[in-house]
Swiss-Prot record:
Alphabetized SUPFAM superfamilies for the sequence: ARM repeat
InterPro entries, per database record: ARM-like, ARM-type_fold, EFR3-like_ARM, EFR3_Homologs
Regions crossing the membrane: none
Family statement drawn from the similarity comment of this UniProt entry: Belongs to the EFR3 family.
Record PANTHER family: PROTEIN EFR3 HOMOLOG CMP44E
The organism's taxonomic lineage, starting at the top: Eukaryota, Metazoa, Ecdysozoa, Nematoda, Chromadorea
GO cellular component: plasma membrane
A Pfam family it matches: EFR3_ARM
Name of the molecule in the record: Protein EFR3 homolog
GO BP term (any one): protein localization to plasma membrane
Compositional bias segments (type: Basic and acidic residues): 704-722
Start and end residues of each stretch annotated as Disordered: 638-657, 697-724
Organism, scientific name: Caenorhabditis briggsae
Amino acid sequence: MNGLCCCTPCKPRYRRLVDSIYPRAVTDGLLHSNMQKLTFYAISHPEKLERIGEYLVMRMVRDLNRQRPVQVKIAVEAMDQLLQACHSSPSLPQFSENHLRMVQRLLESNNAKMEQLATDSFVTFSNIEESSPSYHRQYDFFIDKFSQMCHANPQAAYGEDFRLARCAGLRGLRGVVWKSVTDDLHPNIWEQQHMDKIVPSILFNLQEPDDNGGFSSSHIPKFDNNFTDSTQSHRGDDEATPKVLSDRCLRELMGKASFGSLRAVIEPVLKHMDLHKRWSPPPSFAIHVFRAIIYSIQSQNSYFVIQELINHLDSMCSADASTRIGIATVLSSIVSIAGTSIGPLLLSIFNSLLKHLRTSVDFERSGKCSDQPAEKMYQEALINAMGDFANALPDYQKVEMMMFTVGNIPNLDERKSKQGEEFLQHVLVKTLLKVATKYRTAYLATVFTDSFLDTLLRLALVRDPQVRLATQQIFHTLLDRHDNAANLVHLGYELDVADVQLTVEKCSRADQMFMRKHIGDITYMLWRAAAAADETDLSTHADAILCTMSLLCIESLVELFRLSMALQQLALDTKQNFSDAKRNSIHNIVAKYMNLSAQLIANPSLCQQVQHVVGCRAQRGIPGLNLLLSVKESPMNDDPLSSTAVNGTIPEGTPRTITEGDHALLFNIEDVAESLKASGKDASRLFVPFNMSLNGRDGNGDSWQREDGQNFDSTDGRESPDGYKTVGIDDVSVDMSVDWTPPISRKQSRRNTIFSIVNPPKLNASTVDDLKAYANASFDPIEEDRKEKELTGSILSEIRNTDFEERVNTNESLNERGDLSKSIARLLVRNGETTKVRDIGRPTKPKNVFEIELPSFAY
């Protein structure tokens, strides 16, 4: 029938209208007046729309085969105008199929200009919202063709126009995604087979190198608008390059992906990074891609991207260190963006990072690691990732992360630990420090739970000096609530503490209760940390200890004065194998802290004592003890005795450190106590001896011996200064301020009243000479046996020959207060006499009826 209608009068009306839009001259374009007639006819007769499309496609194919580009463009333009005008027609799905056939024939021509024309027409089609769904439409061909165009290169048929071909391919893929997402009953564009073509095509253009040969995102604008692009005239200057356009395509693709489709998109991204080695440091391209992904998807789905990256890191555990470093760096860069949505998987993700950290440490220490510096960089990247991860979390989750990190630190309770475990301690403490720097302490009891504080106190006393130093820095970070640590970390001798610019506030009641419970353990840790300070880095460790003491100054004033006196005595102890430099460093810690605390509490007498001691030390010229050298306006600098250290010449006979006989160079505990009492402080705790000694071992299992012979075990329990054994670190309750009352002694306790030992055996004086004599005395077993038999015989004879009542009376007569009943009777008598004296001169109280005596005749 079509062949018979060869003459114009015999053609159907819709064909005559289609033929009329073509001009007679080749140079003329589409006849718009006739195009309006065709459009009106198509709208008025929707049943003819499908046939109009078929006829236009037939003419376009004929013109394409005859290489008539002008007629081809006219047919494409007519199809686009009809598509836009008849978007609500019931015949639009059938017309759309004809339109897609036309686009397909143009793309199959392998002509760059025709492909560009087809892409523009397809983008126009993708912006049409169809009122009725399409049940059989497929876009497989378009995905394949547009992906192929995205990989155009100068050696192909495109020549110098390969960038235009890439842009056309990207816009075509963008149109496919948009049309697939918006259509009802759309084909599943999120299938893995489609994403394996779309995502690599986008990333291939996004990774296009710049003029310097590397990747740079400085010229890529941030797109926040929705997808809008209809024709070539709508493409602005921001989409002139494939890199800019591919970035926008990636963001739109991720923005339209649902939670169930994320895996299909993320997996091709990870595979592309592996194949193109985009993880190699610095992974700027990978960071840009994943940041674009995180910012484009819904915020509640951000944790899924983090989890996929960690799973990919699991699968790459045997890869090169550079690859793992790149993945960890990407995690560190994007984890803060997704931090607010990771709540449900917080510990799972953090545990995965810690597991990779432990695996890296074990691999480095196994001897199989060929590139240890790269492995250390990988560990640093993981630590930074955990720190950045913590920075985006609320405070209560940061505390959970710190507790979780502490729980992974190995072998703190064992007596000996392996070298690899010590290194793991060092790495995990660095991780803990990184997380702690992101936390802002409000109340001490909130962050310093019993188990957490116990672990920190143990970490501060391990073998590794770097771990001890990092633990002190953790204390600085968590104790510092007013940003004072930066001014205290290298505190010198200040004539005026106001120059340090410290922020001082009154201690809260909650912090007072916390310090009352735990200050004993903290001061003990500081004392041992000073004793175990590394000789090779004395100044750093001394500054760290001084900073911790200064941060605790307000919360526990008297106890830290007591610690200072103990540190001074430690520096004077000749039994300790300390160098002169270490002794002088401890003396300087005491002097600097005394100077700071005296000025903070505004105690003039104590400030005068500190200045006197520091001035005497400067005059003596002992190397390392002249704290006035750093003070510009010091009156002591003009003294000839103090200038010896400045000139670098030390006279012969000048001592290298302070001895116990140099009373003028030492702080007197009685003078300090008097100064504190004058300012209204209770200084009774200063005289409680700080009797810990260093006879134990220095390591992880901590068992220490006190000077009075009582064993001290930091894991099982400890003896208090008054002789009471406490259960453990969490039960210690000692003074931290001025309102402390000493506990009742055992002799005054009611549980030891009747059967107490009144005359305890007299012990020998525990002086050094007596102990040496006792230790060097020869042991005579016969004499010891004789004395034991005599003591046993005397006790047995007393029991056999003396009655029990007589022995009880003898014991009571020695100490009447030992009898509880007699003590009560004595108190009653005394109270009765006091009442009688008080009632003298007062009128007699009337007797009650039970006290009136009857007359004698009544009997």
